[in-house]
Amino acid sequence: MAIAMTDAELKARHRRMWASGDYPSMVETFLLPLGPRLVGAAELSPGLRVLDVAAGTGNASLPAAETGAYVVASDLTPELLDAGRARAEAAGLTLEWVEADVEDLPFEDESFDVVMSAIGAMFAPH
């Protein structure tokens, strides 16, 4: 039996789900190797403008910032961005954290050299 819901309802459900658990701990346990691998595959270098879509707590954003790239981490869930901001601060990294919907990003076309997403973009309904 399918449950019909609007995109807005689905996104609100995702936002609540990601904010309700201990996602940062889960990242540390299961997903930590994924970010550096993605960054390595993207061959980032100093000065590149990088957007991490559905960045969560910065699993890929932080390793991207370590390359010297200018990084913007965007996510639908402010609680995850807060956790990422704390991780970045503890690591001495500077990057921008932006609450944003992957389906309605607030950036001009061609604002970035590289756009990446570790796993989060797959949750967007379209």
Regions found by a protein language model. Give the residues of each.
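N-terminal, positively charged/glycine-rich alpha-helical extensions of SAM-dependent methyltransferases
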Residues: 1-19
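Conserved donor sugar-nucleotide recognition element shared by glycan-biosynthetic enzymes
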Residues: 7, 27, 31-35, 77-80
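Class I SAM-dependent methyltransferase Rossmann-like catalytic core
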Residues: 21-26
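Conserved alpha-helix/loop element of class I SAM-dependent methyltransferases that forms part
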Residues: 28-48
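Class I SAM-dependent methyltransferase SAM/SAH-binding core
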Residues: 49-105
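A short acidic, Gly/Pro-enriched loop at the edge of an enzyme's catalytic core
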Residues: 103-115
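Residues lining the SAM
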Residues: 117-121
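A short, conserved alpha-helix within the catalytic core of class I
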Residues: 124-126
